Amino acid sequence: MTDTVSGTSGTSGAPGASDPSDAPGAVRPPADPGAGGFTEALAEATAVASLAPSSHNCQPWALARLTGERARAAARLFAGTGNRTGPAGDGTETLALAMDRTRTIGALAAHDVEMRVSCGAYWQLLLSALAAQGWHPEGIEYPATDGEGRRLAGDRWPKSWSLLGVARVRRTGDGDGSLRRLRETAAARRTNRGPYGASGIGTDVLAELTGPSAGAAAGAPVAVTHLRGETERRAFGNFVARHGGRDFSHDAAWRETFAYLRPNASAAALRGDGFTLEQLFGPMSAARHHLLRTALAPRTMRVLRFAGYPGLLASQLAAIVRRTPAVTVMHFLADEPSGADMVRAGARLADYWLRATHAGLALHPVSVVVQHDDVRAALAERFGLRGRVFFVARLGHPTAQFPATPRHREAAAHLRL
């Protein structure tokens, strides 16, 4: 049984609604309590948004608060672009979303899409947390190209930042009391790679996950397909068995992935990004940890691939996939989505993941099937998916807890311009 739901707009059912640190003007929570209203609300919102998911836990987002002439420049820049999703207005605060290329991955062409999707997830959490405090978007706009940041802030715009979007928010009242729930749900969200329970997921629950969204996710040009039937899940498992070893046999991609694999939790916390073997495979003995880390090292992998090791890892992943009660597939409505589409898709993904977390469900992305062009095309053809696929994950009730991933100290920062 396959269920597909296309993107819609409306009121969100998601919880809560919906390296600039050394640069002059960098701001981090907690906010100055004497600064008043929006500064405090923004500090709360960035703390929540910093918990957004990202590929390799690289946290590629960046945020600027535009003031004075720079805020007016933003209004002029996007006037008449056709990328507007709301009216302009006075008395608003202006925020600029950017991608910091010093914290992105890029070994594969598809990684650029993943980075924009990751930034979109952050954007949605940020706007949802602001809305929960009474600050609602009056307009969200997206530039036609990445190079518009300097038109907003001139030389003050960081060279490594690519502008992805601008939002104007206005306080329309007090918070609705949902901030705490949003914060707790965002903190509870995990990538859980362990086994899931055998019990199915009801159609009513899936309908909740794919319900209308607000904020940056409103009307996102995205469809969600759930592979639920035994035949479909077995077919997807077979697909993973056939293609799941690609990352391990791709030198550049695997070197980049391994570079984010931290030796232990302390090292991960110190770096503030990446992941540990325990976050990939669950708890393990010191001996198994050493063996796995040695086997996964790029130099070792180049030898082991001739012995079929990537295929063995793919078959192990496929076995877990076949026992999963549902597989979530998110795909654009277009074959060639725009940069704005990618950011909005990330916002939609954030809503979906938070709703799943609130429902007691877990997600485990199976990214290898979307990161290589030929594999992604074969996936779409095999399962009749229209538009470019950008996210595939196991969905189910977790049977084991996985630790949270660390956060970079700049993940909750913003730059005031």
Residue spans of the language-model regions?
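Acidic, surface-exposed loops and disordered segments
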Residues: 1-12, 18-417
